């Protein structure tokens, strides 16, 4: 099973969301990367992330929502599968050959990082401060920097001084020997 995390956050504060939306303006290059990376894959998210998705093209992706409270009525017209827990999703998809991309929220990212072989993290630096009510937890960042190889920068856009924003997308790869190994064994 090939599991990746793909998420964006503000570089300095680690802001992740604000009132169910991204805390920064739309960044074309980041959205293009996200769409290309998640195409023809299984996209896993929590309920709030599902509700926050724009009405974008959802073709070429299998959507999974992890929620113990969502109802079938809420998603009747959408092409998604619902699982009560990330563990039940893993069990059901254990033999899949499709790439799996976990996109949020932060609780699900924190749980899924234990199973991930790759993390794509977009770090956005805004010249003006952003407002947020959800942040990437320090524990998730610590896990990322302790269990994964030093990142490879795969995209850089903008200038942090002369632009409204700069964007850096980094790819972290976990050494194969640590994929799926609980954190207490890694130390």
Swiss-Prot record:
Pathway: Cofactor biosynthesis; tetrahydrofolate biosynthesis; 5,6,7,8-tetrahydrofolate from 7,8-dihydrofolate: step 1/1. Pfam families: DHFR_1. Residues 2-174 form the DHFR domain. The keyword NADP applies. The keyword Transcription regulation does not apply. One of its GO terms (biological process) is response to methotrexate. Keywords: Antibiotic resistance, Methotrexate resistance, NADP, One-carbon metabolism, Oxidoreductase, Plasmid, Trimethoprim resistance. PROSITE patterns: DHFR_1, DHFR_2. Gene3D superfamilies: Dihydrofolate Reductase, subunit A. Its EC number is 1.5.1.3. InterPro entries: DHFR (IPR012259), DHFR-like_dom_sf (IPR024072), DHFR_CS (IPR017925), DHFR_dom (IPR001796). NCBIfam families: trim_DfrA10. Homodimer. Key enzyme in folate metabolism. Catalyzes an essential reaction for de novo glycine and purine synthesis, and for DNA precursor synthesis. Confers trimethoprim resistance. Belongs to the dihydrofolate reductase family. This is Dihydrofolate reductase type A10.
